[in-house]
Structures are given as C-alpha cells and as structure tokens.
C-alpha cells in the first residue's frame, strides 16, 4: 500500500545536505479555565498586551482561547523552549486561571454565552470579531472552542535545488509549489498515521452532543462521559471541527493556479443554508456575508499550503505572488502529556513524515479520490486501535491491515531518520522511529489509549483538571530560558501601541469599510 520510495531514499542518502536547514514553527491553542474547569469569563490577560498585534500570544475564536505562536526556527530544542517560555510567562500572569490541557473542552454548554475574541475598535479588529460571529452562527460556538496544535514546516532551498529546480529560474515558484502539493497529496493519503499515534481525544463530555442524536456507538460512563473504545481523535471527526458544507467545493491539490481558483470561487459562492441566518438582525451584523466561506481562512483542512501575507493581502493572493512557502499541518490534538501541548518526539516524527511525503510519488488526485481518502481517516479517527482494522488506497477496494501499513511506512522513515541524524549528529530521529513503531504492534502505547485509561478512571473533567493544576504549578515555578521578563513587557507595550496606531489611522466608518471587504 505504501508507494515504493527506494529510489528517492537512495537519492536522499547521496544528498544528505539537501535536508540541512529545515525550518519549522508551532502554534498551540488552549482555553483559559477556572480551578473547577469552567471556562474563564475574564478578558484577555492584561500582561499579554494586544491580542490583535502581539507577535507571540493572541486569541483564536473566543476571548478565553489563547494561542501561542513561535517564530520560525531551525532548531527544535530552541523552538520548544521558546514555546515553553510563552507558557511560563502566561501561567504567572493569569491569576488563578489555568490552561486546559485537552483538545476537547468540558465544563461548557452550548447555550452558555461564549464571549468572542475582542480586538479593539479598528476596522481590522472589528472584522476579526465579526468573522467569529459568523462562525458561531454557522457552526455553533462550542465546536469553535476545540483546540489543537499547528506545525508549520518548510524544506530548505537546497532541497529543491538538488531535487528538481533551478531556484533562480522563472518557473521556480511553480516547481517548488508542485513539490509542496505532492507533500499535501501524500498527507491526505497517509496522514491518518498522525491521529493513530498522537490523537488524544477519544472521548467527549455529554454537553458536547447537546442532546442531538448520533449514529456513533458511544459507550457512556457514570459521570456522563461518552467514548468510543478504539477512537483516537474525535476532534477530527464530524463531531469536532469539520465542515460538511465544504465537502463538495471540489478544491484540489494538484496545481497552484487550480487550487487558488477553487478557493477564490468558494468565497464568492452563495450558500442557501447560510443565507437563512441573515446578514443583520436588530442592527447587529451576524456574518461577513452568506457565501460558502466568509473568508479564505474558513476553509477547513487538515493541512494547508501557506505563504506569509503582506499587509492587506489574502492568503490566496500571497500564494499567487510567490508560490507555496511552507506547509501548515493541522491534525495534531493537544498532547495532554506535555505542559506545552506538544513535545520533541512529535516534532521529529513530523519532520520525518513531511520529508517522506516530499519524496514519495504522489499521483494527481481528483476531488472524488480526495473524498475517498476521508474513509481511511474516519476509520482511524473512530476506531484506529481496533484489532484487525484495515485501510484502503483511495477509492480502490483492496484492503491492508493498519499495523502492517504503519510498519512499512516506518521502514522508510527509519532511513530518512538515519540521513537527518547523519547531518545533525546523534541518533535522535532514529530513537523516535524505534519508540513509535512499537505502537503498531501495541496500540496501548498510543496517546489515545493512554489518555482514555485516565478518563475512564476520573472522567474528562477530572483528568483535565489534574493535568491543568500540575502544569500550572510546574510552569509558574520554572525560570524563563530564552525570553526575559523585560522582553514580554516590551512586546506588551509595543503591541498596545500598534493597536492604538491602527485605531487612530482608521478614518472610514466600519460599515463603509466592510462593504469593500465583504
């Protein structure tokens, strides 16, 4: 089932320097909660400055949903320590609140008024909050409080230069983008390995179902927790953050211009369903517009092609201007076993898997095959640890045992690991392969199995509160390592100044400004 990568691996072993200079970055979301696990109702902590303009700490959907962002980094240890510093400083500056250590929220009901993230009075800030109002009215606020980790990854120019392209040539943008689309297609075909190993949301609190019927065969504990015994990541299931209305958009990942055209089409396509919500009610705006996507960011995807945008530029226009610059992997649940929600083993695994995806052959993929890849993902998400589970290739009928496919993949990853270790020194990547491959013979080693054991004992709430308390105490005690207290104070002041400048510079009324941007 795994493509034959032997020639590409042999090429890599002859050109190990092509992997020198991999760059990556991390984003981690987490809900601020009170000691009893309920969602915090306070505003964004003052010490963290402006959520609109802060370089490292912002908010996602809700005012209580923190998001930590590391700068682009070539050093894994440095990146993780930077992320830990962001958590340490925040833990010391959020009073008695703590960070929820799980992807799925618990003590939270749909009817509860979840305050949307607030970004001040500038037109840009108000637009961001209005976008969130639209998300709430379209999908419900509860779904939007699910949190995850995003891993951003780029291969060095030396890789593309050696592999395919004269990077000074006029078609370099297209060729490098084609290389990243190959990564994306392979990710759709084989990325289910990520929830298999690292999915950590096998259960949900009963409030999450909101009394709606579900066809999933949930088992229920006395404390009202619903779980599937072999599930890995309910966050990635239809219960979690997915968007059914987008499934027939027909966006494909074969070509830069085709992809951008599909995205631009979706933000112009009217939706009957969202038109029913209305645009305004009693003088209050309910969504930016009633199209299938209000803006491009609303496209739900487990992986995204990205380029850093310039001021006022849309993500797709940035891609058209310069091609794909990096890939954003969006399928990681919060790692409950790490105080910062992600660890070195996961980052090293993703490095290996992304390199493998760049090497493995990836035939073009129609929108119907893209839909077929969802079958494998759903199997792994809902019953990934089930004995005898099989997976298929695209829309073909042949089936292969998951443990065998996993071990075949790791045979290739081990060779990538040897190459990466040869240029970095040590055996860190090979060690990760040896640790993780064991999960295919023994699913009890996976994150989902480990966290489910705890949840069955103490419930999601009990598990979440215990980890949150332990991590709060740990992070508050640890000294900063890379950033200093004064760096945070300076960034707080600078972010507040930047927000102030944006608000002062806006002369156009929001309603007029919005007509141009909606």
UniProtKB/Swiss-Prot annotation:
Keywords: ATP-binding, Glutathione biosynthesis, Ligase, Nucleotide-binding. Signal peptide: none annotated. Its EC number is 6.3.2.2. GO terms for molecular function: ATP binding; glutamate-cysteine ligase activity; metal ion binding. Pfam families: Glu_cys_ligase. Pathway: Sulfur metabolism; glutathione biosynthesis; glutathione from L-cysteine and L-glutamate: step 1/2. One of its GO terms (cellular component) is cytosol. GO terms for biological process: glutathione biosynthetic process. It catalyses: L-cysteine + L-glutamate + ATP = gamma-L-glutamyl-L-cysteine + ADP + phosphate + H(+). InterPro entries: Gln_synth/guanido_kin_cat_dom, Glu_cys_ligase, Glut_cys_ligase. NCBIfam families: glu_cys_ligase. Belongs to the glutamate--cysteine ligase type 1 family. Type 1 subfamily. This is Glutamate--cysteine ligase. The lineage of its organism: Bacteria, Pseudomonadati, Pseudomonadota, Gammaproteobacteria, Enterobacterales.
């Amino acid at each position: 089932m795994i493509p034959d990568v032997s020639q590409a691996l042999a090429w890599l072993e002859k050109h190990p320097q092509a992997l020198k200079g991999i760059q990556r970055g991390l984003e981690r979301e987490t809900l601020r909660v009170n000691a009893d696990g309920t969602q915090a109702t306070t505003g964004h902590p003052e010490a963290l400055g402006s959520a609109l303009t802060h370089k490292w700490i912002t908010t996602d959907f809700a005012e209580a949903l923190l998001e930590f962002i590391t700068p682009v980094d070539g050093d894994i240890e440095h990146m993780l320590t930077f992320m830990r510093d962001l958590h340490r400083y925040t833990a010391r500056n959020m009073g008695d609140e703590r960070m929820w250590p799980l992807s799925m929220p618990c003590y939270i009901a749909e009817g509860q008024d979840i305050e949307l993230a607030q970004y001040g009075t500038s037109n840009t800030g108000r637009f961001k909050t209005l976008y969130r109002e639209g998300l709430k009215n379209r999908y419900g606020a509860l779904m939007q409080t699910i949190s995850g980790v995003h891993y951003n990854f780029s291969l060095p120019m030396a890789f593309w230069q050696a592999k395919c392209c004269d990077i000074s040539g006029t078609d370099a943008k297209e060729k490098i983008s084609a290389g990243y689309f190959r990564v994306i297609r392979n990710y759709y075909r084989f990325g289910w390995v990520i929830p298999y190993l690292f999915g950590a949301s096998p259960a949900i609190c009963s409030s999450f179902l909101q009394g709606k019927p579900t066809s999933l065969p949930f088992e229920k504990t006395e404390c009202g927790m619903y779980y599937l015994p072999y599930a890995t990541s309910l966050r990635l299931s239809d219960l979690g953050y997915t968007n059914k209305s987008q499934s027939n958009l027909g966006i494909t990942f074969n070509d830069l211009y085709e992809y951008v055209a599909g995205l631009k089409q979706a933000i112009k396509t009217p939706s009957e369903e969202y038109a029913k919500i209305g645009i305004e009610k009693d003088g209050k705006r309910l969504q930016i517009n009633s199209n299938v996507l209000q803006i491009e960011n609303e496209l739900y995807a487990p992986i995204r092609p990205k380029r850093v945008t310039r001021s006022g530029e849309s993500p797709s226009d940035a891609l058209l201007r310069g091609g794909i610059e990096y890939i954003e992997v969006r399928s990681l649940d919060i790692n409950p076993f790490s105080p910062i929600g992600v660890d070195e083993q996961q980052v090293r695994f993703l490095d290996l898997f992304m390199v493998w995806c760049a090497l493995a052959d990836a035939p073009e993929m129609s929108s119907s095959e893209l839909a077929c890849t969802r079958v494998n993902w759903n199997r792994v998400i809902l019953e990934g640890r089930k004995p005898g589970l099989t997976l298929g290739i695209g829309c073909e009928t042949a089936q292969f045992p998951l443990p065998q496919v996993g071990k075949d993949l790791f045979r290739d990853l081990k060779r990538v690991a040897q190459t990466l270790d040869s240029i970095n020194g040590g055996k860190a990547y090979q060690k990760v392969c040896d640790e993780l491959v064991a999960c295919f013979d023994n699913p009890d080693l996976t994150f989902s199995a480990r966290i489910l054991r705890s949840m069955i004992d103490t419930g999601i709430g009990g598990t979440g509160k215990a980890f949150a308390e332990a991590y709060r105490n740990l992070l508050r005690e640890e000294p900063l390592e890379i950033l200093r207290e004064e760096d945070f104070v300076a960034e707080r002041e600078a972010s507040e100044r930047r927000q102030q400048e944006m608000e002062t510079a806006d002369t156009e009324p929001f309603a007029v400004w919005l007509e141009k941007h909606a």
